[in-house]
Regions:
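Flexible loop/turn segments at secondary-structure boundaries
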Residues: 13-14, 65, 78, 115-118, ...
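Residue-level detector of short coil/turn "hinge" positions at structural boundaries
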Residues: 5, 64-65, 103, 137
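Extracytoplasmic/secreted proteins, especially bacterial periplasmic and envelope-associated proteins
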Residues: 40, 44, 49, 53, ...
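Structural transition elements
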Residues: 64-98, 113-120
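Short, solvent-exposed loop/beta-turn-alpha elements that line the ligand-binding surface or hinge
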Residues: 2-8, 17-39, 73-91, 101, ...
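Alpha-helical secondary-structure segments
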Residues: 11-67, 93-95, 105-118
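Periplasmic binding protein-like
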Residues: 1-6, 109, 122, 128-175
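Glycine-rich beta-alpha junction loops
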Residues: 62, 74, 167-170
Length: 175
């Protein structure tokens, strides 16, 4: 009998989460308010990411930039919604200025270093991209056991992680 071996892409989406609900970010130099509470700041961070560069240089062509969290092949995925907005660092700077952060701000990114393919390398690349828009991001890369316990645990004031990397995959292909 002959065997037909098929290689298919993983249906995992890697993303950065941002604490939007806390009154103040724990690691930020901005006190008394939370930059991520402003949609313009979150959009600025999004437009700062050159996903084609990450796909090419970090992932060596073995990834597909996603516009939504649901991967192709998963029930609920729609191709027309799975379109990324463009990489646009100038727009990012404009959005930050409009939100009241013309000089950017500083914070920490929590990243696993042993969970996803090239996880820490993706975080390092993103940090360089955020720097180009004036946002200083300090990397806190840890093993997955430390990373996940810190990201999921909050306190009375909200989350303890200001910005973090996570992945979402659906082995059942049903969102």
């Amino acid at each position: 009998s002959s065997h037909d071996v098929k290689m298919t892409p993983q249906n995992r989406t890697i993303f950065f989460g941002m604490d939007q609900g806390s009154a103040e970010l724990n690691s930020s130099n901005i006190k008394g308010k939370n930059p991520f509470a402003d949609k313009r700041v979150r959009l600025a961070m999004y437009h700062a990411l050159d996903m084609d560069a990450i796909q090419d240089k970090v992932m060596r062509g073995q990834s597909v930039p996603a516009g939504i969290i649901t991967a192709p092949g998963v029930n609920g995925h729609t191709a027309e919604r799975d379109q990324r907005l463009p990489y646009d660092p100038e727009l990012s700077k404009k959005l930050l200025a409009e939100a009241g952060y013309p000089d950017g701000f500083e914070l920490t990114l929590d990243c696993p270093n042993d969970r996803y393919i090239n996880d820490e390398a993706i975080c390092v690349a993103a940090i360089g991209m955020f720097a180009k828009i004036g946002v200083t991001v300090n990397l806190d890369a840890k093993t997955k056991s430390q990373h996940f316990s810190e990201v999921k645990e909050g306190d009375a004031n909200g989350m303890t992680s200001d910005m973090y990397m996570l992945g979402w995959g659906v082995p059942t292909f049903d969102s």
